[in-house]
């Protein structure tokens, strides 16, 4: 059995299967409702029901308060129709967003390598090509682990049927521990995607600043490769932050890109280099490297930030103090399952601040 859900004010009607959430059905039919966590904890996908019956699902009482439930508000990521419905949603349409349909795929692990002492690089061969926009992510289901995990795609969309992931081991994390200790080449995984609205605004030709920390390098790497491969002429800056030299992974890749593309700049920063690193580059946090490089004058750029929340917050503060407008800053916050247990989203948050 399926139900018809009409989304106002755009007037689009989608078909939602029994036991399927409104959000999942919408994304699979090319309607990109606003969302972030996908687990009922952040409230980004809140919509107003104007007609129909439904199961509100496992929405957090913090994300959907009792008074909102009484007003027939629901979270699209949790709500399952029990009749035809009409909802009102704030659908943000961006001309640069391609809106590829979310689909299910079977993936085979074809390569596993150590990118750093704490980060694995995983390459997957999919059962058919996937269309995605550089900066987006996939959800991965691991054997005998409840729920899916979100990981950003690190390779360029030009690699047909291939998905590269950078996965940091999280202390106590079931999925990342499985990846680091049990996953092997030849293993098969169920994935779905693409998800997310973290992407380059190509119609805006301002120079681009990418700021990445830890495994948050994955999305910027994909976006930078895509821009350079397409012949984009804007100046592209990558500021990569790490603790020490061992954690500064893929450095050789970006140093080669500097040689190959005159419009690409690479500025790595280590906040705690070891004596044996013999580090001569910038020492300090990555947001401090940005302020130092641009001498606190970042106006006239677009900025794309990806990494842990504390890095994102520091970088936003630095950029705005350096005269970059809020509308020109786009972020992807990496949160682990442990963060979710503390009441935050369990997946990456993708937003324009």
Swiss-Prot record:
The protein's matches in InterPro entries, at most eight in alphabetical order, are given as:
2Fe-2S_ferredoxin-like_sf, 2Fe-2S_ferredoxin-type, 2Fe2S_fd_BS, Beta-grasp_dom_sf, Cbr1-like_FAD-bd_dom, FAD-bd_FR_type, FNR_nucleotide-bd, OxRdtase_FAD/NAD-bd
Q: Which residue intervals define the domain 2Fe-2S ferredoxin-type in the entry?
A: 3-93
**Which reaction does this enzyme catalyse, per its entry?**
phenol + NADPH + O2 + H(+) = catechol + NADP(+) + H2O
Instruction: Name the needed cofactors.
Output: FAD; [2Fe-2S] cluster
The record's remark on the cofactor is: Binds 1 FAD.
Pathway recorded for this protein = Aromatic compound metabolism; phenol degradation
Q: Which UniProt keywords apply?
A: 2Fe-2S, Aromatic hydrocarbons catabolism, Electron transport, FAD, Flavoprotein, Iron, Iron-sulfur, Metal-binding, Monooxygenase, NADP, Oxidoreductase, Transport
GO MF terms held by the record = 2 iron, 2 sulfur cluster binding; metal ion binding; phenol 2-monooxygenase activity
- UniProt-listed GO biological process terms: aerobic phenol-containing compound catabolic process
Q: Can you tell me which residues bind [2Fe-2S] cluster?
A: 37, 42, 45, 77
Give the Enzyme Commission number.
1.14.13.7
Q: What induces or represses this gene?
A: By phenol.
SUPFAM superfamilies per record: 2Fe-2S ferredoxin-like, Ferredoxin reductase-like, C-terminal NADP-linked domain, Riboflavin synthase domain-like
Top-rank EC class of the record's enzyme: oxidoreductase
> Where would I find the FAD-binding FR-type domain in this sequence?
102-201
Task: Explain the purpose of this protein.
Answer: Catabolizes phenol, and some of its methylated derivatives. P5 is required for growth on phenol, and for in vitro phenol hydroxylase activity. Probable electron transfer from NADPH, via FAD and the 2Fe-2S center, to the oxygenase activity site of the enzyme.
| Quaternary context | The multicomponent enzyme phenol hydroxylase is formed by P0, P1, P2, P3, P4 and P5 polypeptides.
| Name of the protein this chain belongs to | Phenol hydroxylase P5 protein
Which species is the source of this protein?
Acinetobacter pittii (strain PHEA-2)
């Amino acid at each position: 059995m399926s139900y018809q859900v009409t989304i106002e004010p755009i007037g689009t009607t989608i078909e939602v299967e029994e036991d399927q959430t409104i959000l999942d059905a919408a994304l699979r039919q090319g309607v990109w409702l606003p969302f972030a966590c996908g687990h009922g904890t952040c409230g980004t996908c809140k919509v107003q029901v104007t007609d129909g019956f439904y199961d509100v699902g496992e929405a957090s009482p913090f994300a959907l308060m009792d008074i909102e439930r009484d007003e027939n508000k629901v979270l699209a990521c949790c709500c399952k129709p029990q009749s035809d419905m009409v909802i009102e949603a704030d659908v943000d349409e961006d001309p640069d967003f391609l809106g590829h349909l979310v689909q299910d795929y079977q993936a085979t692990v074809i390569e596993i390598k150590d990118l750093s002492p704490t980060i694995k690089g995983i390459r997957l061969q999919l059962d058919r090509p996937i269309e995605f926009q550089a900066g987006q992510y996939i959800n991965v289901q691991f054997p005998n682990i409840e729920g899916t995990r979100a990981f950003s795609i690190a390779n360029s969309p030009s690699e047909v049927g291939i998905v590269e992931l950078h996965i940091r081991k999280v202390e106590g994390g079931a999925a990342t521990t499985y990846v680091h200790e049990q996953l092997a080449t030849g293993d098969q995984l169920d994935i779905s995607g693409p998800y997310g609205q973290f992407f380059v605004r190509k119609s805006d030709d301002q120079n681009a600043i990418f700021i990445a920390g830890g495994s948050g390098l994955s999305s910027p790497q994909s976006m930078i490769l895509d821009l350079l491969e397409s012949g984009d002429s804007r100046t592209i800056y990558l500021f990569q932050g790490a603790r020490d030299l061992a954690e500064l992974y893929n450095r050789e890749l970006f140093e080669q890109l500097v040689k190959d593309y005159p419009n690409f700049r690479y500025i790595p920063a280590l906040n705690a280099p070891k004596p044996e690193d013999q580090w001569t580059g910038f020492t300090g946090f990555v947001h401090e490297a940005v302020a130092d490089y641009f001498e606190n004058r970042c106006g006239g750029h677009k900025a794309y930030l990806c990494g842990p929340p504390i890095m994102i917050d520091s970088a936003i503060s630095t950029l705005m103090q350096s005269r970059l407008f809020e509308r020109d800053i786009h972020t992807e916050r990496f949160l682990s399952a442990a963060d979710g247990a503390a009441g935050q989203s369990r997946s990456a948050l993708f937003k324009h601040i």
